């Protein structure tokens, strides 16, 4: 309702605002309803006759059960849309990876085609919907598998973000690769990574070159700290050039990376303005999809939608500083 109101009544076309608002409203609404239930139950017993209190309790419990059912149904009915083809595959499923439950999206028009494993950006990022949208053409010639890495959206609960290390990603990546090699009967698969995933992919290929036909990097990262220093300086120079004193003061106050704490918020302070700069200067043009539309996807239940943002924040904040 919130999204429809913004788009069709108020005529506001702002995917990022819609996502943040919709998730916030979901959390606030569910939290408020559950809090109201507790208050209602307590007051029912304190201020009402026994019969009225019993009826009120029954109504409250029923409402609570319906709310829980709504959340559960949203989780268990999440899916990836069907793919048409001679022998198609379109599955969204959990897999056991080194004793933990993580998620895979598998999509392709012919399951006999070579497997292409895609590693999302992050750490903590989820690109199930982005991959489905952007890699539709690849599904003709490959079985495109998107791995929800530990700490990201649907795989958020696989492990405490504070316990994730680079070795965790490498071990889990090797295990996912082995699952795919065994299931599809392929000695070697293709590997592709975006941003953080491009660095992870290089390291996975270095450890097990015998498992991969080729590696494809997009937004390739090779030096985490140098990347952040360059991004920080670019954002600071652009803020000075455009007279954005508030941003200049904020960036100068926090200083350049590396950071020992508050990494997610400090990194976002200069990365977020850079995205706007790229669009304003024409460096980014012709885009057909925004990553911020991702949480709308049918791949995510209500809890997943919350974890989409919380997982990125928590996991990035816990892991990224250790990659410097």
Where are the model-predicted features located?
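A catalytic-pocket lid/entrance helix-loop region that shapes and gates access to the active site
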Residues: 207-260
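Short beta-strand element of the alpha/beta-hydrolase
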Residues: 113-122
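Glycine-rich "HGGG/HGxG" loop immediately N-terminal to the catalytic nucleophile
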Residues: 128-129, 151-164, 226
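Short glycine-enriched nucleophile-adjacent loop
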Residues: 198-210
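Conserved acidic catalytic loop of the alpha/beta-hydrolase fold
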Residues: 168-188
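The serine-hydrolase catalytic nucleophile loop
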Residues: 126-135
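Conserved alpha/beta-hydrolase
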Residues: 139-156
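Alpha/beta-hydrolase
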Residues: 238, 242-324
């Amino acid at each position: 309702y919130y999204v429809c109101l913004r788009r069709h009544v108020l005529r506001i076309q702002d995917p990022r605002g819609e996502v943040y608002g919709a998730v916030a409203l979901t959390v606030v609404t569910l939290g408020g309803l559950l809090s109201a239930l507790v208050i209602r139950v307590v007051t029912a017993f304190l201020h009402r006759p026994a019969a009225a209190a019993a009826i009120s309790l029954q109504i409250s419990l029923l409402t609570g059960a319906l709310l829980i059912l709504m959340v559960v149904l949203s989780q268990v009915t999440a899916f990836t849309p069907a793919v048409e083809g001679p022998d198609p595959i379109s599955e969204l499923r959990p897999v056991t990876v080194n004793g933990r439950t993580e998620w895979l999206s598998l999509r392709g028009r012919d399951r006999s085609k070579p497997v292409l494993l895609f590693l999302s950006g992050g750490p903590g990022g989820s690109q199930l919907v982005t991959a489905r949208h952007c890699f539709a053409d690849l599904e003709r010639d490959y079985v495109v598998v998107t791995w929800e890495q530990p700490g990201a959206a649907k795989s958020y609960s696989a492990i405490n973000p504070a316990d994730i290390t680079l070795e965790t990603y490498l071990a889990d990546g090797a295990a996912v690769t082995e699952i795919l090699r065994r299931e599809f009967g392929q000695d070697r698969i293709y590997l592709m990574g975006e941003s953080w995933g491009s660095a992870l992919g290089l390291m996975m290929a270095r450890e097990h070159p015998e498992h991969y036909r080729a590696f494809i990097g997009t937004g390739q990262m090779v030096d985490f700290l140098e990347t952040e220093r360059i991004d920080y300086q670019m954002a600071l120079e652009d803020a000075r050039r455009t007279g954005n004193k508030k941003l200049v003061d904020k960036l100068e106050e926090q200083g350049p990376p590396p950071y020992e704490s508050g990494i997610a918020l400090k990194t976002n302070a200069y990365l977020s303005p850079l995205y706007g700069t790229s669009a304003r200067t024409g460096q980014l043009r012709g885009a057909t999809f925004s990553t911020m539309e991702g949480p709308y996807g049918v791949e995510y239940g209500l809890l997943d939608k919350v974890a989409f943002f919380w997982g990125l924040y928590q996991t990035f904040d816990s892991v990224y500083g250790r990659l410097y």
